[in-house]
From Swiss-Prot:
One of its GO terms (molecular function) is mRNA 5'-UTR binding. Pfam families: CsrA (PF02599). The keyword Cytoplasm applies. The lineage of its organism: Bacteria, Pseudomonadati, Thermodesulfobacteriota, Desulfuromonadia, Geobacterales. The keyword Metal-binding does not apply. One of its GO terms (cellular component) is cytosol. This is Translational regulator CsrA. InterPro entries: CsrA (IPR003751), CsrA_sf (IPR036107). The gene is csrA.
Length: 79
């Protein structure tokens, strides 16, 4: 892991298209501004972990589970 020290307003550049700027420091919190391509997803780690967990649960559904859901909803997708 690369560890950098930055002051208020200073920037870290990653590759050609990502810039991370220190925009505010208050107590033990730092606010970062991130410029990146629109197609790049940026998450706080706790949100990323939650999304990954939900994706794993969704991927673990079997075909039988999906068929039951479709049957419960009916052919038109309504209860």
């Amino acid at each position: 892991m690369l560890v950098l020290t930055r002051k208020m307003g200073e920037v870290v550049t990653i590759g050609d298209s990502i810039r991370i700027k220190v925009v505010e420091m208050k107590g033990n919190q730092v606010r970062l501004g991130i410029e990146a391509p629109n197609d790049m997803r940026i998450y706080r780690e706790e949100i990323y972990i939650k999304v990954q967990r939900e994706n794993q649960i969704a991927a673990s559904w079997s075909l039988a589970d999906l068929e039951k859901a479709v049957t419960c909803l009916g052919a038109d997708g309504k209860e």
